[in-house]
Amino acid sequence: MDTETLCLITADSGKVYGILKAIFGDESEIVKKLIDFDVSIRVVPLNLGLLNIFRDNAADLDNADLMKRRFGNTMGSRIVEAYRRSQDSKYKRNVCKTTGLLVCLFGGGLGLSREADKHKKFVEGKSHNILSVEMLKRALSIGGQNVDANKISSFWFATYTIFTTVYSPRLRYQAGSSKRIIALSESRNQYRSNLFWDLRDDSSHEVMSMVHVLSALFASALTAYISTRVAHELTQGNDERESLNNVLVWLKTLTFEPSTIALIAYIWLVSPTDAQATITIGSVMESESSDDFPDIVKILSYTSNTMLPVQLLEDGRTAYCSVADGYTTHTTALTLITDYNSSHMSDKFGVLINIVKFEHAYALHYVHHKPRDGKEMTITSPSSEMMFTSVVVTPLSSYPLIHARNAVIDWLRTFVHMFPDSGSLVIPADSYTWIHNLAQDMFPWVRLSTTLDIRDDHYFQVLCDCLSLEHDSRNHTKVEKLIKYMKASVYNFTSEARGNMLLAITVYK
């Protein structure tokens, strides 16, 4: 997904370049030039909750009483004010003269600071909560910069799923005294899909809250990295204006996968300083044009509070770091070897559950489960003949089998939301590749596990079918029936809804 769909690209003052002092030094002439130039690029995360509210209540946005009843006085008033400003013919966007970007000088909140009216680099305009207005205009506009709320919601839910299953368990190994570490909720698939509901930040809306955290982390990280790109342009002999506009052109060409954003958010969260995080993220962002393996290995530097050393395999082309958690070992690896899913790697590290692909390297995450006291673990699995039956699970197959149920729920929840029209379940031809890639990015370990002896697990089979939609029309029909059967209850994962899904899976196996 491209940057302009994921975020608002705005103009800010030169204070954004403050992070460069820690990278280049306080006396750097480049840093002084940029701060004096006093124009920078800031990436602002879209508020997905507001976007969905705007879209779902499009017919009533001018009804103050109704909006206040639905969302409370503060939120309701904010929505109505944003809508009325967006419809006002006299509404004037504050635009940066240098870049043509929307101005976003941060004051005490998300609106413009009072300094914006006096800033020489920007068109004069009255301070107001401009971000809500711009989000509303994008949510309701036809064409142009219209945000496809279905796809962007699905994208962020995929990012959330990857982050909470791959990276957040590792945060327990970070220094407990660090102020950068925050309480991150694990995925709770038995609760309703809060991502597609409103912006009420309480315990029952943990998914949306986590999406806000991830989008903010990503925006902060990208903003910091952009400042280093501008500094680099300046060293190439360009002036400040040209440097800024060159970076802006580059920024608008970027695309991201959910797994890459999850990785960037994790690095930004756990790195000791913003400056160090920016350098590390640079290794990730620039990997597509560089095969400098030592630079890419830097993303492995912060795995635990003991700063476990990065180790190399015998071939010298694979670096890894492992963290043990009782009967589970998490291993992050970077390799230049294209055959990263070989038996040699699996035997050493366990089940491959996440892949971030670069042009010259692969970032991999493995999980290995060790049976207690050398015994085989058993779990319950739904069956069409018996409601529950005991299935023997080997260490190699335990991860995909245990998580297949949640993966199916996640995937169907994402998939159903992409096609909200209950009267039609026809998948557009140009959506096949996008759907397949999204599912593959969320659950890359499924294909690697298809040879394991776990085919009797109906959830796992449905997930495999989901990942091969474009190859087999029979699988398409099966999943289509599943979605149609579940459509009325898929958003509210009550016990009844879960029972319906279990029945659907057993019936359409």
UniProtKB/Swiss-Prot annotation:
Record organism: Rice dwarf virus (isolate Akita) (RDV)
Function summary: Transports viral genome to neighboring plant cells directly through plasmosdesmata, without any budding. The movement protein allows efficient cell to cell propagation, by bypassing the host cell wall barrier. Increases virus accumulation and symptom severity.
Subcellular localization, as worded in the UniProt entry: Host cell junction, Host plasmodesma; Host cytoplasm
Keywords noted in UniProt: Host cell junction, Host cytoplasm, Transport, Viral movement protein
Protein name as it appears in the record: Movement protein
Gene Ontology CC: one annotated term: host cell cytoplasm
Major localization listed first in the record, in broad terms: host cell
Keyword Transport: yes
GO annotation terms (biological process): transport of virus in host, cell to cell
